[in-house]
């Protein structure tokens, strides 16, 4: 008998599911055919919107809801080639839409390969900073909301154990190099054998920030059959080296900086101003006061300068909302600051180069660089925070007189020619007296100023381009006075390990290196000397004093003994000895030693030096290292050709060995993970067994038929069981019974407490 279905309810049977599945396969086959037939030379002109691309309906729907309609130049060139599954190396200006250029191919690749939540990690996106990783993840969730993939974000500053428990169930993983490398090494369930796509965003920045070891570790965990997409705003030798290691026959897309009209957006107005070092804060204060209705991003070279400038300007209150952002901030604070500045209409953000890459802050009016960037590429990325996606923007670069000539030459190579801006003395206001007052009143502010001073000089000292950065020409005393300090602090510059490597080093490993054999942390503090220790170390001021010994003539040596107590004295020294008086040290002391020495000499003389020979196919013996005659060498060919043949032969051998070594290393890592997984499984089983073996002890009270045989009156509310009073307590249920004949009956007391209670009751009665 058929069941009556509610109106509007859909029924899916097996035939309907089969029809839908076949329909999806036909659509994917048509899209794949369009991708294979795509020719960049002829079809690129006809592609102007996302709807013209061979992508699925769900992706188009997500793009439309996120208001992404038109394609940029880099997206036109890269997305169709990336959809074919080929490796790609894309270079374009900042703010040109590189994020969508790799997110769309990632989503489409997983759809065509029919990746589900049970297939594990299929796409990995690596970003240099946490803020950029968060931004990529937000865009991914917007355009991929109609797909059924699981995506995760892993960055520093979060709970590692929480991420480890869930990272194995992710299909798409976005994160920073350090945290991704940690999960690949430690997460037991994280498998990369099914990885389809690897994306390296801002690859040059990943290498510049000291993440080379982490990137190499990530590449070592991934299969070689993957597709790799590498994107950056600038190309460098390190990026090319990384491309050779991780990409296979890559398509290099994007116009190089030599052929471009300019490496910066055309809608960006660029200016520079020549400012002495001791007037930088005055110029910055005057600039902020004259642009209170603007959104300003200010770059410094160190986090200490950001902290000092933020605290002092916040105290002076310029009339605009001030914010700060640098690497040592906690992750929650960094995200909160990023969101506030993005939503603010008029604000000023003091930051380091942590926000110079990839972050899309909407409607930034001015980008001010208080400190000179380390190179032209850093300048391009800094000013790229403004004038994004065709909007207008302005940038201002402060240069010292010693930096002006060298920096402008390096910018001119990249077709960047900022205009000189002159500052009127009337509009410039000095805040040096206010800063001196703050540092005098507040020791914390003075300490911040000293640390900012030292950080700036160190940042200039470590720069590689000595033609631009000349630390010996910096006016230390006048700069310290401009910060409000009474004098220039002493600077200790330590050599050795790179600051970037120190910053990215694991703090757990550093703490572990300071422990002793027992695992306890060693401290550099010496043992505390008490007054009793000093008393026992005190020298006698009478008999053993130096003055007393000099007067009496009894000198004491270092061992505390008097020199007069010696019974032997030296009569002469350094005199010539006769050869007849010297003993013959070569003669053996005993007959056994003499016989042994003679037999060893005889054996060595008869054997000679050992030689090792090798035999050819004809049985002729040859030495291991046999020199070739000049005639035979000439017959073999030209020396250069022989050298090239030898190098090529060794290169092929090294390639084969490299593949073998990588496979062995991968198997070792997999075996380590399997062992760790087995240990965790056994621990869970032992915990379950212990829980099952726990015995529940039930204590039974005295039987009470009246209470046990009570019938339920139908109420759902259970009445609380009243505690039965003891025999010595008062009440109606007291076990004491008063009879009419004047006698009182009590149970026999068993303990001392019962006896004392009985006595108290009798006295009371």
Swiss-Prot record:
It is an enzyme of class 3 (hydrolase). Residues 744-756 have a biased composition (Acidic residues). The keyword Cell membrane does not apply. Residues 79-253 form the Helicase ATP-binding domain. Its EC number is 3.6.4.13. Residues 267-439 form the Helicase C-terminal domain. It catalyses: ATP + H2O = ADP + phosphate + H(+). GO terms for biological process: rRNA processing. This is ATP-dependent RNA helicase DBP4. One of its GO terms (cellular component) is nucleolus. ATP-dependent RNA helicase required for ribosome biogenesis. Involved in the release of U14 snoRNA in pre-ribosomal complexes. Required for pre-rRNA cleavage at site A2. Residues 655-765 are annotated as: Disordered. Belongs to the DEAD box helicase family. DDX10/DBP4 subfamily. It comes from Candida albicans (strain SC5314 / ATCC MYA-2876). The gene is DBP4. Keywords: ATP-binding, Helicase, Hydrolase, Nucleotide-binding, Nucleus, Ribosome biogenesis, RNA-binding, rRNA processing. PROSITE patterns: DEAD_ATP_HELICASE (PS00039), HELICASE_ATP_BIND_1 (PS51192), HELICASE_CTER (PS51194), Q_MOTIF (PS51195). SUPFAM superfamilies: P-loop containing nucleoside triphosphate hydrolases. A motif (Q motif) lies at residues 48-76. The Q motif is unique to and characteristic of the DEAD box family of RNA helicases and controls ATP binding and hydrolysis. The lineage of its organism: Eukaryota, Fungi, Dikarya, Ascomycota, Saccharomycotina. ATP binds at residues 92-99. GO terms for molecular function: ATP binding; ATP hydrolysis activity; identical protein binding; RNA binding; RNA helicase activity. The keyword rRNA-binding does not apply. Residues 655-668, 720-738 have a biased composition (Basic and acidic residues). It is found in: Nucleus, Nucleolus. InterPro entries: DEAD/DEAH_box_helicase_dom, Helicase_ATP-bd, Helicase_C-like, P-loop_NTPase, RNA-helicase_DEAD-box_CS, RNA_helicase_DEAD_Q_motif, SPB4-like_CTE. Interacts with the U3 and U14 snoRNAs. Associates with pre-ribosomal complexes.
């Amino acid at each position: 008998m058929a069941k009556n279905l509610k109106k509007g309810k859909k029924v899916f049977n097996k035939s309907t599911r089969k029809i839908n599945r076949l329909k999806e396969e036909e659509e994917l086959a048509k899209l794949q055919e369009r991708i294979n037939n795509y020719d960049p030379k002829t079809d690129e002109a006809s592609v102007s919107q996302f709807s013209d691309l061979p992508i699925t309906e769900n992706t188009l729907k997500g793009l439309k809801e996120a208001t992404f309609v038109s394609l940029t130049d880099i997206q036109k060139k890269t997305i169709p080639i990336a959809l074919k599954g080929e490796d790609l190396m894309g270079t374009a200006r900042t703010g040109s839409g590189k994020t969508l250029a790799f997110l769309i191919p990632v989503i489409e690749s997983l759809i065509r390969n029919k990746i589900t939540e049970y297939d594990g990690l299929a796409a990995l996106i690596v970003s240099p900073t946490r803020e950029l990783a968060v931004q990529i993840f937000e865009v991914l969730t917007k355009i991929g909301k109609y797909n059924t993939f699981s995506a995760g974000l892993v960055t520093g500053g979060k709970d590692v154990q929480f991420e480890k428990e869930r990272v194995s169930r992710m299909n798409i993983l976005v994160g920073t190099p350090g945290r991704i490398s940690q999960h690949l090494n430690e997460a037991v369930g994280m498998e990369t054998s099914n990885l389809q796509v690897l994306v390296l965003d801002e690859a040059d920045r990943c290498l510049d920030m000291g993440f080379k070891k982490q990137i190499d570790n990530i590449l070592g965990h991934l299969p070689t059959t993957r597709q790799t997409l590498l994107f950056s705003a600038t190309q460098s030798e390190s990026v090319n080296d990384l491309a050779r290691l991780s990409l296979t026959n890559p398509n290099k897309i994007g116009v190089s900086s030599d052929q471009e009209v300019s490496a910066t957006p055309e809608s960006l107005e660029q200016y520079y101003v020549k400012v002495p070092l001791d007037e930088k804060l005055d110029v910055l204060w005057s600039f902020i006061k004259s642009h209170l209705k603007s959104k300003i991003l200010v770059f410094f070279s160190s986090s200490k300068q950001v902290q000092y400038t933020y605290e002092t300007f916040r105290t002076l209150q310029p009339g605009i909302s001030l914010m700060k952002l640098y690497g040592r901030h906690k992750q929650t604070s960094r995200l909160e600051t990023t969101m506030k500045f993005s939503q603010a209409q008029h604000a000023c953000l003091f930051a380091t180069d942590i926000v110079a890459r990839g972050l899309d802050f909407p409607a930034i009016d001015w980008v001010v660089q208080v400190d000179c960037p380390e190179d032209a590429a850093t300048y391009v990325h800094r000013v790229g925070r403004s004038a994004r996606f065709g909007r207008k923007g302005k940038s201002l670069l402060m240069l010292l007189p010693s930096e002006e000539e060298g920096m402008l030459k390096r910018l001119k190579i990249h077709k960047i020619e900022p205009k000189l801006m002159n500052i009127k003395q009337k509009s410039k206001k000095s805040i040096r007296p206010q800063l001196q007052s703050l540092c005098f009143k507040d020791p914390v502010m003075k300490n911040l100023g000293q640390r900012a001073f030292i950080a700036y000089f160190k940042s200039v000292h470590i720069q590689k381009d000595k033609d631009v950065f000349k630390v010996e020409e910096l006016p230390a005393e006048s700069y310290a006075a401009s910060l409000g300090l009474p004098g220039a602090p002493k600077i200790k510059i330590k050599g050795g390990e790179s600051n970037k490597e120190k910053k990215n080093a694991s703090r757990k490993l550093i703490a572990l290196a300071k422990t002793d054999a027992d695992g306890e942390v060693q401290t550099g503090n010496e043992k505390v000397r008490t007054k009793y220790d000093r008393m026992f170390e005190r020298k006698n001021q009478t008999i053993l004093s130096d003055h007393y010994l000099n007067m009496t003539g009894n000198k004491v040596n270092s061992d505390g003994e008097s020199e007069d107590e010696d019974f032997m004295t030296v009569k002469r020294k350094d005199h010539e000895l006769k050869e007849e008086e010297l003993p013959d040290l070569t003669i053996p002391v005993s007959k056994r030693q003499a016989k042994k020495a003679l037999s060893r000499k005889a054996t060595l003389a008869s054997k000679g030096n050992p030689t090792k020979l090798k035999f050819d196919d004809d049985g002729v013996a040859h030495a291991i290292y046999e020199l070739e005659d000049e005639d035979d060498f000439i017959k073999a060919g030209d020396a250069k050709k022989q050298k090239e043949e030898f190098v090529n032969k060794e290169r092929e051998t090294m390639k084969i060995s490299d593949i073998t070594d990588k496979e062995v290393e991968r198997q070792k890592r997999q075996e380590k993970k399997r062992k760790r997984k087995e240990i965790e499984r056994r621990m869970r089983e032992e915990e379950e067994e212990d829980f099952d073996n726990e015995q529940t002890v039930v204590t039974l009270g005295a039987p009470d038929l009246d209470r046990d045989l009570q019938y339920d009156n139908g109420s759902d509310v259970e009445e609380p069981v009243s505690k039965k009073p003891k025999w010595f307590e008062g009440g109606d249920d007291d076990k004491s019974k008063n009879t009419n004949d004047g006698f009182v009956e009590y149970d026999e007391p068993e303990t001392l407490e019962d006896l004392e209670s009985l006595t108290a009751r009798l006295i009371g009665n």
